[in-house]
Amino acid sequence: AAATKDFNCRMAEYAKAVVDGRPNFHISLVVDISPNCDCHFENDAPILPNIGMFASFDPLALDQACVDACLKQTPLPNSQLTDAMAKEGFCDHHDHFENTTPNAEYKTCLEHAEKIGIGSRDYELITIS
């Protein structure tokens, strides 16, 4: 777990190196939300429905808004997540990502990003239909 937390902190630091002092705008398409990082070759079917597009000048607010939107969704049936939830002894973390990959420690990245000044986890969500 310590190595994962360290990796997530480094990821935030590398992101800061890219955006610090430069104008930037970020767009996230929250679709085909897989159980593992997109970089994993062994990925499975999406665990959540497609949510939409998010955009912000603050990359951290954007990430937090995307996470929050995902956590409000009902997991897709017959996905790795719902299969795990149906198993006897399932430990519900009340977080789709922690339920799918408990050791990912994704919140560490967001917390560290805020601590080092990439942006704020606070946001105002404006919905456009």
What role is predicted for each listed range?
Residues A1-S129:
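Extended, low-polarity segments enriched in aliphatic/aromatic residues
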